Structure formats: C-alpha cells, structure tokens
C-alpha cells in the first residue's frame, strides 16, 4: 500500500476561490477506489506530526504560497527533503507553486521541476484550451477540454530533458497541460501585481506549460499544477481526471488504463467549504 498525504492550506480568498479543504476532500473521496493507494487529507496548512511525512510515499500541497507558504515554517523543507531523498513524490497545486527565490525555490525546482516566480511569472485569469497531451500515465483517459482559471504563465523551469531515452541521470520533464494565451491575456491585467510585464507581452504566440510532471534520477516523481483557483472547476470531468491521475502517479501507483474514474453530484461542490465573509 502506497501512502499519499494531501495538505490543504488555511482559508483565504472569497468564497468559491482557494477552497483548499473542500478540494482536497473531494480528491480524497475520488481516490478511495484506486487499488494500492491510501490517502490522508489534512486541513490547516500542515500535518499534525513528523511521523505523517515519514510514513508517506508522496506529499501534495494545495495552499497559498509566496512568503506564507506552508513549507517555509519550522523545518518543513527539511521534512519534505527527507521524503525526497528516499525517493518520495511531491506535488504542488495552484498558489503552492510559488516560492520566493531566496526561500524554498531551489528545493522545489529540484523536487518538481519549476515554480512560480514573483514578477517573472504572472497570474491572469483566462480560458485555456487543452487539445493535445503527451503520452504519459497522467494523461490516460483525458480528452480535450477547456476551463477558465487563474492559469499562471511564464513559469520558471529548472533544467530538464524532454528526450526520455538514455536520460536516467537527469530529471525528465513532461509538459502535461499546454495552452496558448492570446495577446490580451498577456497584456493583463493580471490578478496581482496587475502588470503588464514587458517580457510576458513580448512572448506573444508562445505556448505555455501550466501543468507538468518530472521524474528525478532517483525515480522520485513530482508535478506542478498552476490552475485550481476556482472550486467550481472540479465540476469539469477532464480537469479532475488529469489531477487525480497526477496524484496516483506521483505516489508511485499505476494509473488505470482509462484514468481515474470519478462522479460528481451538484451538492458535492458545496460540501466542506471554508467559512468566509462575503462582504
């Protein structure tokens, strides 16, 4: 049995946005039927004790990032680093992909292959269309789809190889979700800072990687997902399938041939929401 730990960040943003607890509980429920996988979800930004990480095969964080990133408190970078050194997996979702250059970014680059960098990357809300996918377990059963989300672009990626033959001594990289923002998206305004950034505008026409996966030389795995801002997007079956597949894969469990199956009732999106002010 492989153990996956899902960590939900503390409440933030208006209702329906950054619903970390509700999102991780949905993911936990959908993964319950995957053979060989045990999933534990924790609220409040971290696990209750070191033993949880020590017993995990993978840790995935869905939380606010930047200077308030859960990894930057206490010796959590060290705890996850120990997991990585024994071949464990790491996943970062949405804002959790942002780490300061001087605090945590280098570690995250080594673990998951890249990060959102303040003033280099940007965070527009736009409708991304995903039409083609690489051959990879994470894309099994995933069909073309589109969602409007705060899809970060111009992610800062570490050195990697996309040639997957004879490259076991380097980190291998797969662009799982790619889409092309139009010039209006690049020109902003972004969510914050509003921009625009000249280097982002100058890259007009370029395809952007908004979800990726890596396999490290020690066979440990990682992934990053820049979307996940709007809770309602869990209602999109293709979006949730690609994320569920990533959670299974990063833990070292075989992804089903047609991807992880999930069902959803309308009320499911209303459960476990954080109490937030609407004013």
List each model region and its residues.
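Helical hinge/lid and interdomain linker segments adjacent to catalytic or ligand-binding clefts
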Residues: 5-6, 12-100
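Active-site-proximal beta-strand elements of phosphoester/diester hydrolases
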Residues: 7, 176-178, 223-227
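Short aromatic-enriched loop/helix-cap "lid" or pocket-rim segments at secondary-structure transitions
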Residues: 18-19, 102-106, 187-190
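Catalytic beta-strand/loop cores that center a nucleophilic Ser/Cys/Thr
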Residues: 32, 118, 122-218
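Short, solvent-exposed loop/turn segments at secondary-structure junctions
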Residues: 11-12, 66, 97-99, 180-184, ...
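A glycine-rich, often tryptophan-bearing local segment used as a flexible ligand/cofactor-contacting loop or short
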Residues: 66-144
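Extracellular ligand-binding/catalytic regions of CAZymes and related secreted enzymes
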Residues: 1, 23-26, 33, 185, ...
């Amino acid at each position: 049995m492989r153990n996956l730990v899902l960590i939900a960040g503390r409440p933030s943003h208006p209702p329906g946005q950054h619903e970390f607890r509700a999102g991780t509980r949905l993911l936990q429920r959908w993964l319950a039927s995957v053979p060989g996988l045990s999933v534990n979800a924790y609220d409040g930004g971290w696990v209750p004790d070191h033993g949880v990480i020590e017993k995990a095969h993978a840790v995935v964080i869905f939380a606010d990032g930047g200077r308030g990133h859960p990894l930057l408190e206490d010796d959590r970078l060290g705890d996850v680093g120990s997991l990585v050194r024994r071949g464990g997996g790491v996943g970062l979702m949405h804002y959790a992909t942002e780490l300061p250059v001087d605090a945590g970014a280098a570690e995250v680059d080594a673990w998951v292959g890249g990060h959102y960098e303040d003033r280099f990357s940007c965070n527009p809300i736009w409708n991304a269309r995903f039409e083609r996918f690489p051959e990879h377990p994470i894309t099994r059963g995933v069909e073309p789809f589109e969602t409007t989300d705060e899809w970060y672009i111009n992610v800062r990626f570490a050195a990697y190889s996309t040639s997957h033959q004879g490259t076991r001594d380097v980190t291998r990289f797969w662009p799982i979700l790619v889409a092309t923002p139009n010039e209006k998206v690049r020109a902003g305004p972004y969510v914050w800072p509003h921009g625009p950034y000249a280097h982002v505008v100058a890259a007009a026409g370029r395809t952007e990687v908004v979800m990726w996966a890596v396999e490290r030389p020690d066979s440990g795995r990682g992934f990053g997902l820049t979307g996940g801002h709007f809770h309602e997007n869990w209602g999109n079956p293709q979006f949730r399938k690609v994320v569920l597949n990533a959670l299974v894969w990063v833990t070292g469990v075989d992804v089903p041939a047609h991807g992880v199956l999930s069902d959803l009732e309308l009320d499911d999106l209303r459960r476990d929401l954080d109490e937030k002010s609407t004013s």
